[in-house]
């Protein structure tokens, strides 16, 4: 997976990382090419040892509770769409590789499984869910940003041709599962024809938790500076660094 430069996304991202008073919003939109090279090919070969690329993997139902296989069916229909809530292992690899590239080097998603992903029922539902979360958090600032945001995404990925997936991990695996996390979402807009994924990730962190962490980090840095003054330079490299987690 290769991160593709996009100046429109950079402009939008600068407005998705803000402090709202009682919370911090941290969001980003990134575009990735699905063309594999080097390490990706090696990882894909290892991934395929558990199943061939065309094998279908069952996904979890979307958090809406509405399965894509049910859209367009009458309420009395009992049959279940065999493909709607599944994806090929190759597509699953693309989703996992996107997470790895986006969160590198802090997290490794190589062990992620299909049940941690969902296929979303429709573009409209995803757009409304994103808009609702960000309007509640950012108010009028997002109202003015919204058309530019979705125009930039559509221009990059052609939304009408996309399958949309989300990552909804267990708490133990969630990179946003730390204390103080108020909400988060992780959406993948996958255009198979373009061999490209746009990844939209956002979270809201309690202002108290975020400030407390920053204050702790500053204190750690002050302590390290004092240690630098007190200790011989030859021993400085052996000291463990303090981190705010």
From Swiss-Prot:
GO terms for biological process: negative regulation of transcription by RNA polymerase III. One of its GO terms (molecular function) is RNA polymerase III core binding. Keywords: Cytoplasm, Nucleus, Repressor, Transcription, Transcription regulation. Signal peptide: none annotated. Residues 59-84, 223-245 are annotated as: Disordered. Its main location: nucleus. It comes from the Eukaryota. The keyword Ion transport does not apply. InterPro entries: Maf1, Maf1_sf. One of its GO terms (cellular component) is cytoplasm. Gene3D superfamilies: Repressor of RNA polymerase III transcription Maf1. It is found in: Nucleus; Cytoplasm. Residues 223-232 have a biased composition (Acidic residues). Element of the TORC1 signaling pathway that acts as a mediator of diverse signals and that represses RNA polymerase III transcription. Inhibits the de novo assembly of TFIIIB onto DNA. Belongs to the MAF1 family. This is Repressor of RNA polymerase III transcription MAF1 homolog. It comes from Xenopus laevis.
């Amino acid at each position: 997976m290769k991160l593709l430069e996009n100046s429109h996304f950079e402009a939008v991202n600068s407005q998705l990382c803000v402090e709202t008073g009682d919370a911090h919003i941290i969001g980003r939109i990134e575009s990735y090419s699905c063309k594999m090279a080097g390490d990706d090919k090696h990882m894909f070969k290892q991934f395929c040892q558990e199943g061939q690329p065309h094998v279908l993997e069952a996904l979890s139902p979307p958090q809406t509770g509405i399965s894509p296989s049910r859209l367009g069916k009458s309420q009395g229909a009992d049959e279940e769409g065999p493909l709607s809530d599944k994806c090929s292992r190759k597509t699953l690899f693309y989703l996992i590789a996107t997470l790895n590239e986006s969160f590198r080097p802090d997290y490794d998603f190589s062990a992620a499984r299909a049940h941690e992903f969902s296929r979303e029922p429709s573009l409209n539902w995803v757009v409304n869910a994103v808009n609702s979360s960000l309007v509640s958090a950012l108010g009028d600032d997002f109202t003015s940003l919204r058309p530019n945001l979705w125009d930039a995404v559509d221009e990059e990925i052609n939304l009408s041709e996309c399958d949309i997936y989300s990552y909804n991990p267990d708490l133990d695996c969630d990179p946003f599962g730390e204390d103080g996390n108020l909400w988060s979402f992780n959406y993948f807009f996958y255009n198979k024809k373009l061999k490209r994924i746009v990844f939209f990730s956002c979270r809201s962190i309690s202002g108290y938790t975020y400030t407390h962490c920053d204050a702790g980090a500053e204190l750690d840095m002050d302590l390290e500076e004092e240690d630098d003054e007190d200790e011989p330079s030859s021993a400085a490299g052996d000291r463990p660094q303090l981190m705010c987690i």
